[in-house]
């Protein structure tokens, strides 16, 4: 049975979240829609204006438009926006990443404003990019928002800690079972669980794609469900649709590399996707791991090469 479709969330007071459409678009990966909604929505308080701008600039980051964020967020901007700018600075300037992480380490060692959820999320995002999931989890653990918990679920699944991810998901379900983030986290955990749960995950991704839009995130989620069930041809159709939307999206390219191998495609097809991934995302974990394996192989070849 399909999950309930995302709908306007209301708090305990019964008030509809003014930013529901902005947040929902961001969470499902519809970044341009998020930007459009953020520029259109009229809000009731300066605090909501800041929250809207956080999602607006995070959507620009997701589109790799780092300059927009760096140019528009000023030193006088709210602390939440400064946190987004810090992540933009990290993503835009590879040569400055070590110093940005060192400064972040110093901030985290002091008293952190745990009510600034955006800072915790941006700190965790930087640590995750820096291949330090433990530090990312420590940052997220200080927050109690649904988004902090959803990101915790993602990281735990990357670490193959399905047991802990399930506990975090239970917390999300107790807090708001129908929230978009909770539904997505349910799909991620179901995908990692496998077996009969794969169909549950597929239904969640499909329902969101039908009700909202088939974003790259949702298409790759559906494709991953098919791949886990050995339905390679069905997965290929979804991945081609994703590729048509954005030929440089890393998850699509990684999934196509895996799929091409399983379908026995010619080596040049796989190599083409690999080259696209290297061109657009040379620091992607998949590329780093692939290059490490290549180097290991080259060392083995030299080790067993006949001596002159």
UniProtKB/Swiss-Prot annotation:
Q: Can you provide one Gene Ontology molecular function annotated for this UniProt record?
A: structural molecule activity
* Keywords tagged on the record: Cytoplasm, Cytoplasmic vesicle, ER-Golgi transport, Golgi apparatus, Membrane, Phosphoprotein, Protein transport, Transport, Ubl conjugation
* InterPro entries linked: Coatomer_esu (IPR006822), TPR-like_helical_dom_sf (IPR011990)
Residues that the record marks as modified (Phosphoserine) are: 13, 45, 99
In its record, the post-translational modification comment is: Phosphorylated by PKA.
Q: Which GO terms describe its cellular component?
A: COPI vesicle coat; cytosol; endoplasmic reticulum membrane; Golgi apparatus; Golgi membrane; nucleoplasm; transport vesicle
Presence of the UniProt keyword Nucleus in the record? no
Query: What are the annotated disulfide bridges?
Result: none
GO:BP terms for this protein? endoplasmic reticulum to Golgi vesicle-mediated transport; intra-Golgi vesicle-mediated transport; protein localization to axon; protein transport; retrograde vesicle-mediated transport, Golgi to endoplasmic reticulum
Cite the record's note on assembly.
Oligomeric complex that consists of at least the alpha, beta, beta', gamma, delta, epsilon and zeta subunits.
Give the protein family. Belongs to the COPE family.
Q: What is this protein called?
A: Coatomer subunit epsilon
Which species?
A: Homo sapiens
